[in-house]
Swiss-Prot record:
Main EC class the enzyme belongs to: lyase
Residues the record marks as active site: 71
Record organism: Vibrio atlanticus (strain LGP32) (Vibrio splendidus (strain Mel32))
NCBIfam families linked: MGSA (TIGR00160), PRK05234.1 (NF003559)
Catalytic activity as recorded in UniProt: dihydroxyacetone phosphate = methylglyoxal + phosphate
Name the UniProt record assigns to this protein: Methylglyoxal synthase
């Protein structure tokens, strides 16, 4: 597939997602990183967004709940270039009813080459990177070329 680039802005669009057993862990991480997070635009699946907003006072645009389609809503935003990075504390030891949606969300994040943290250590690495508050050019699929090849 041919590639093109897009520029992530200085103020990133960050998706925050957590499975039920990991919501307390994400909440703790968000509280620890609140000062950095408030410089960015935050999105979340419904239940996670409601919890984080209520407990931290951060402005978060919440989708609907993940199992009801929120994972897919975030995936659509990623494919439109409207999400720059994702912090997704998922539960690798317990199946969830919407496992196919979870896999699709992680797949689409990989397709569109956005940074994804699936645990606290990786989230800390991302948030301690100087790139967090800089414009960053990333390679992404050239959808126009892809379309031209297929039609």
């Amino acid at each position: 597939m041919q590639k093109t680039t897009r520029t992530m802005p200085t103020h990133k669009n960050i998706a925050l997602v957590a499975h039920d057993h990991f919501k307390p862990e994400l909440l703790r991480w968000v509280k620890e990183n609140k000062e950095k997070l408030q410089k960015h635009f935050l999105y979340a699946t419904g239940t996670t967004g409601s919890l984080l907003s209520k407990e931290t006072g951060l402005a978060i645009k919440s989708m609907i709940s993940g199992p009801m389609g929120g994972d897919q809503q975030l995936g659509a935003l990623i494919s439109e270039g409207k999400i720059d990075m994702m912090i997704f504390f998922w539960d690798p030891l317990n199946a969830v009813p919407h496992d196919p949606d979870v896999k699709a969300l992680l797949r689409i994040a990989s397709v569109w080459n956005i940074p994804v943290a699936t645990n606290r250590a990786t989230a800390n690495f991302l948030f301690n990177s100087s790139l967090l508050e800089e414009e960053v050019i990333i390679e992404i699929p050239d959808y126009e070329a892809y379309l031209a090849e297929r039609t």
